[in-house]
Amino acid sequence: MANSVFWAIAVALVLGAEAYMPLDYRCGVKPKSRDNCGPPGISPDECVKKGCCFDDSDPDSIWCYTPWKFEDTICNPAEPKARVNCGYPGITSQDCDKKGCCFNDTIPNVVWCYQPIIEAVERDCSAVEPKKRVNCGPPGVSPDECIKNGCCFNSDVGGVPWCFKPEIKKELLQCAVLPKARINCGYPDITMDQCYKKGCCYDSSESDSIWCFYPDIEDVTIIE
């Protein structure tokens, strides 16, 4: 974990001071990394009621998908000069906390309200090879019942469990992404609030780069 935190600090130094992290970007899962969380044709309301995320902006990706589960916020105050701004001049500690950010005003001439690194847990169904699936439900279990129990469902392959245990990963998520490495999460003229609602990061300090982008993942640890 130490190496990943160091990497995040180094990137933050390059980014500048206008990158913001939303209060809750648990739905900011890149399209290619999404795990299905609902049947075909599920509506946004039905998807959200299931505790899932819905995003239909990419026609070739899963629209109703499993969110990240947040475990901890890492403020890492040891490198004050590497902080990435998460507020505005004069922001109070209470308002900073409401944004899901870190606040430390003990050191002058550095950002006081700054981006944390989020420790999250992800259920990864796509990483489980069919022959290595571990059964996670009774015979004939429905997709909805399977998913409600925290399991994965895929009936594309015969002779293996369709309802099976996911691979559980612990990850570090952060918005300190170099401009050239950003993956677009929005559309032209998207606002900061609209970007946050999509569960993504926003940084308008580079005019020629993507402003609304997916958070980066570092330090992946398989825990199950």
From Swiss-Prot:
One GO process term, biological-process aspect: maintenance of gastrointestinal epithelium
Name of the protein in its database record: Putative gastrointestinal growth factor xP4
GO cellular component: extracellular space
Natural source organism: Xenopus laevis (African clawed frog)
Superkingdom of origin organism: Eukaryota
Glycosylated position list: N104
Disulfide bonds: C27-C53, C37-C52, C47-C64, C75-C102, C86-C101, C96-C113, C125-C152, C136-C151, C146-C163, C175-C201, C185-C200, C195-C212
Organ and tissue specificity: Stomach mucosa.
Keyword flag Disulfide bond: yes
Keywords: Disulfide bond, Glycoprotein, Growth factor, Repeat, Secreted, Signal
SUPFAM superfamilies: Trefoil
